[in-house]
């Protein structure tokens, strides 16, 4: 049902800003992005289940052969393609400026982004420092300059791209489309939040910590969605998500 609503909403999103030259093909245009994304997710899941693949073991072997930084780089690089594809699709197919996908304000408010980023970064650093002094036995000092610098570069440049894609796709593209179809804010908030959290079900930590961790992921989706709707823009959500993942 959620997939049907998302597809329908994407079609609806396409009907608003598209010019008459492509309006006759709106159905096709509206279907492409959600079908491609969710088909990739479904194909990945089916392949893992049918081939009985041990994803954690495969990841461990890749890290042993390539190194953790290279594996992280390769995994994050795909989000650069996803983000560029989504933004180009919105700009040239839906004929919408990227600003309208980002905010309802006259221009993107970067101060909001940096406020949320700084707030979350300071909180996370503070919690980590507090935990370090409270439980020093849980930490091992293993600082190495070269791997650290590579990790720093990868994180600073690619993790914000990963989080930006997720925000633009869920809180931008899908939330706007579902909102147009549903004509209210609750349905897009609930659907995008649950699906956003649900996609994290395949993360390795879910296997280790159990399904209870899904409350955190879905709850985070709700919080980011509420931020976007109440502030009428994605700047706060973009800053929060980037700092949280970093």
Locations of regions flagged by a protein language model:
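N-terminal, membrane-interfacial amphipathic/helix-forming hydrophobic leader that caps
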Residues: 1-97
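Alpha-helical membrane-inserting segments
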Residues: 6-10, 39-47, 81, 85, ...
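Contiguous N-terminal and early-domain "leader" segments and peripheral loops that mark the onset or edge
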Residues: 1-31, 145-178
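Interfacial aromatic "cap" segments that immediately flank transmembrane helices
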Residues: 27, 31, 107-121, 186-187, ...
